[in-house]
Amino acid sequence: MKDIYPASPEWRVSRWFNSEAPLSLGALRGKVVMVSAFQMLCPGCVSESLPQALRVREAFSEGDLAVVGLHTVFEHHEAMTPTSLAAFLHEYRITIPVGVDEANPCDPIPVTMQAYAMRGTPTTLLF
């Protein structure tokens, strides 16, 4: 059967946390995938979307559903470094894999955030 919809763009991630190897949509094909795009300084992300992602992770088996965080920094870049993110993930006990959206050298909006036309955080994507 021919696919009638174009494939979703692959994530462009500069670094992974809580994952032994890089993740990709292609590698997760056949599973339902939930992506929680967030910024660690976003109040709604910290109070709502990340706890929701963790609850979803606990509710479904890993064989049926992949839950992935995507740290999409589009403001306050100097405060949201990978070192700061590592401390944040530890402090808030975020155990799902988290990728850092690749920075765009020509724009403050990171690459994956642009590819999916996200308008801000939090954003939840389902594949």
Model-derived segments and spans:
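N-terminal "domain-start" segment that seeds a small globular fold
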Residues: 1-26, 96
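Proline-centered helix-kink/hinge sites
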Residues: 9, 43-44, 51, 97, ...
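Residues that form or immediately flank small-molecule/cofactor binding pockets and catalytic motifs
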Residues: 15-18, 30, 72, 103-104
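Short active-site neighborhood of thiol/selenol oxidoreductases, capturing the structured segment around
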Residues: 22-49, 53, 67
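Structural microenvironment flanking redox-active thiols in thiol-disulfide oxidoreductases
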Residues: 46-92, 103-110
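Thiol/disulfide oxidoreductase modules built on the thioredoxin-like
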Residues: 92-94, 101-127
